[in-house]
Curated annotation (Swiss-Prot):
InterPro entries: THDP-binding, Transketo_C/PFOR_II, Transketolase-like_C_2, Transketolase-like_Pyr-bd, Transketolase_bac-like, Transketolase_BS, Transketolase_CS, Transketolase_fam
NCBIfam families linked to this entry: tktlase_bact (TIGR00232)
Encoding gene, per UniProt annotation: tkt
Binding site for substrate: H28, H261, R358, H462, D470, R521
Swiss-Prot/TrEMBL cofactor(s): Mg(2+); Ca(2+); Mn(2+); Co(2+)
The organism of origin for this protein: Treponema pallidum (strain Nichols)
Swiss-Prot/TrEMBL catalytic activity: D-sedoheptulose 7-phosphate + D-glyceraldehyde 3-phosphate = aldehydo-D-ribose 5-phosphate + D-xylulose 5-phosphate
Family label: Belongs to the transketolase family.
Assembly information from the UniProt record: Homodimer.
Lineage per the UniProt record: Bacteria, Pseudomonadati, Spirochaetota, Spirochaetia, Spirochaetales
Entry EC no(s): 2.2.1.1
Name of the protein in its database record: Transketolase
């Protein structure tokens, strides 16, 4: 595309932005007005993509990390020929619109990730670039680069102030993710005013210290943008391209001020902006007519690029049928199929033996990775304690790209966002691991995964007061309830080693949201199951009967995780007809319906046993009928902490007998 055409495209982006935000009476005009030239360069020339096929695998990915500037993206997608109509633009920020206030994955063709919470977009972009590097090492040959694309992101000062951006950028530099190119819209303005108030550091030096290539130019020089992007592509380091800009450019009433950030220009402001831009104030949603032919030509060129790749892919498939078979296995819907999982042999766990569910998880993960090479992930500096140091998962590094294990370092938030990016990219099934109590560090990324309904997996060990000596800073009590409170999240808390295998199967077959696998530090026994069909029951219903309690149980204990063993001991001690139910997944159990719940519960009175707060169990039992923990723990051996808190089998017996008196 010529510079003249890109100028016309930038003008059209500004026009659509002004009118869409004014019509909605809501939005953020500052960034789209200030960065329209960049969008014109990207979508007019730089990006390797195909608007007619937004899911083409080898496309470049663009992530608008500064998601509040969504009209920049929607306007560019509309002009480029994506299935985003002018009517969609006119319905910006309206209920049911394909152009919501912030970009939403799955809502708008061409939107690669849900963004808006600042810093997470660049972090997911790191995940995209990491996935590209892994897959390129696995599938490319000297003659066939079937995985060869770049990830671009646009950030502002707000993104770079967020800690998660620092975490992810540090990781990207360490791993030398050279296919990652980040544009920094440097306008020195945030909502509160000049960034002199809040952001005095030298960003360029900071990113150089991370191991990035740093380049500088003007947002309003097409030559700068094109040349700097070409320079970035030649370097094997991630690149930060700092583009000096003016927020709200072209709108005289707000240009260069914080007033441009997050409010419509108003009738007078719109009129003045259109005059300044050389537009007719009476004309709304203007698109330069000369763009029609230019953009149609560009769209045809993009389709031809995909056609050329398809030819390359078919030649590669013919020459390397084993690699093609691995490719097909990696790209099944959801990343893992039932038939693939059927080939995984469950490790042998001796009945009556005792081991921590985190240890069992490590054995299961090793078995899974030996069959599923696209299962990848890592830990936030807890590889051993999280039991994810499995022999079948080789480390990934700047020097060794074919590995599948990521040393994320002490960067929980970035880890989760990077896992989300890897999951969005496709071709991999990704997990991240840490102590359960530190899931609070990455909760916003878990929430975005839930909002996007992507099946990121999070392995959370050290799940209760039985952590012991590390004390209450490391003993989660409120965390189970907090995780379960997020819509679309599955929380799986297995009671023993065999349930841990089932938990991983459920997690990997789940496709409509993230999964948290919650695991114990302490040993728990592998117990006999009273129902031979317990595996299918727990997969379908999230819970199953561990102890029948006779033909007509007097009372049922609902328990999860390590408290299932506690409940079994209490049932035995009570000498009453007590049924024990293991609730592996409370969300599935509660969604199973009244009939299934009654069958599993047995129609008896209910007591709950769980080493966490009462919140979330109110529909099943009153607080006084539950053995729960509504207080923090203490430092000491786990069993002694439990005794001190009266969280014991004997305490549960007392509740049971009182309830049956």
């Amino acid at each position: 595309m010529t510079e003249e055409a890109m100028r016309a495209m930038a003008l059209s982006i500004r026009s659509l932005t002004i009118d869409a935000i004014e019509r909605a009476n809501s939005g953020h005009p500052g960034l789209p007005l200030g960065a329209a030239e960049l969008a014109a360069c990207l979508y007019g020339t730089i990006l390797k993509h195909n608007p007619a096929n937004p899911s083409w695998f080898n496309r470049d990915r663009f992530v608008l990390s500064a998601g509040h500037g969504s009209m920049l993206l929607y306007a560019a997608l509309h002009l480029s020929g994506y299935d985003v109509s002018l009517e969609d633009i006119k319905n910006f920020r309206q209920v049911g619109s394909r152009c919501p206030g912030h970009p939403e994955y799955g809502c708008t063709p061409g939107v690669e990730a849900t963004t808006g919470p600042l810093g997470q977009g660049i972090s997911m972009a790191v995940g995209f670039a990491l996935a590209e590097a892994m897959l390129a090492a696995r599938f490319n040959t000297d003659e066939h680069a079937v995985v060869d694309h770049h990830t671009y992101a646009l950030v502002g000062e707000g993104c770079l102030m967020e800690g998660v951006a620092s975490e992810a950028s540090s990781f990207a530099g360490t791993m030398r993710l050279g296919k990652l190119i980040v544009f920094y819209d440097e306008n020195h303005i945030s909502i509160d005013g000049s960034t002199d108030l809040t952001f005095s550091e030298d960003v360029a030096k900071r990113y150089e210290a991370y191991g990035w290539q740093v380049l500088r130019g003007s947002m309003y020089s097409y030559t700068d943008i094109m040349d700097l992007t070409a320079c970035a592509k030649r370097d094997d380091r991630p690149s930060l391209i700092i583009l000096r800009s003016i927020i709200g450019k072209g709108a005289p009433t707000v240009e260069g001020s914080a007033r441009a950030h997050g409010a419509p220009l108003g009738e007078a402001g719109v009129r003045e902006a259109k005059k300044a831009l050389g537009l007719d104030p009476a004309c709304s949603f203007f698109v330069a007519p000369e763009l029609t032919a230019v953009l149609q030509k560009r769209k045809c060129e993009c389709a031809h690029v995909e056609d050329s790749w398809n030819e390359l892919f078919e030649a590669w498939s013919t020459q390397y049928p084993e690699k093609r078979a691995d490719w097909d296995a990696a790209f099944v819907p959801g990343g893992v199929s039932t038939s693939q999982l059927a080939r995984v042999v469950c490790p042998h766990f001796e009945k009556g033996s005792s081991l921590a569910t985190r240890t069992a998880s490590g054995k299961v993960l090793d078995a899974l990775c030996s069959v599923l090479p696209n299962l990848v992930g890592g830990s936030a500096d807890l590889r051993g304690p999280n039991a994810v140091a499995v022999s079948s998962l080789r480390p990934f590094s700047a020097e060794h790209r074919a590995g599948g294990y990521c040393y994320f370092g002490v960067r929980e938030f970035a880890m989760a966002a990077i896992v989300n990016g890897m999951q969005l990219h496709g071709g991999l099934r990704a997990f991240g691991a840490t102590f359960m109590v530190f899931s609070d560090y990455f909760r916003p990324a878990l929430r975005l995964a839930a909002l996007m309904r992507i099946p990121s997996v999070f392995v959370l060990t050290h799940d209760s007061i039985f952590v012991g000596e590390d004390g209450p800073t490391h003993q989660p009590v409120e965390t189970l309830a907090a995780l379960r409170a997020i819509p679309n999240v599955l929380v799986l808390r297995p009671a023993d080693a065999e349930e841990t295998f089932e938990a991983w199967k459920i997690a990997l077959l789940h496709r409509s949201g993230p999964v948290c696998i919650v695991l114990s530090r302490q040993n728990v026994p592998v117990f006999e199951k009273s129902d031979s069909s317990w595996r299918s029951t727990v997969e379908e219903s999230g819970a199953y009967v561990v102890r029948e309690g006779g033909a007509t149980p007097e009372l049922t204990v609902l328990a999860s995780g390590s408290e299932v063993d506690l409940a079994l001991r209490a049932a035995q001690l009570s000498k009453r007809r007590v049924r024990v139910v293991s609730v592996l997944c409370k969300e599935r159990f509660e969604a199973a319906g009244d009939e299934v719940q009654r069958r599993i519960q047995g129609g008896a009175r209910v007591v709950v046993a769980e080493a966490g707060v009462y919140q979330g169990w109110g529909a099943w039992a009153k607080r006084e009928k539950c053995l729960v923990l509504d207080r923090f723990g203490x430092s000491g051996p786990g069993t002694q902490v439990a005794q001190a808190l009266e969280f014991t089998a004997e305490a549960l017996v007392e509740i049971i007998l009182d309830w049956l008196a």
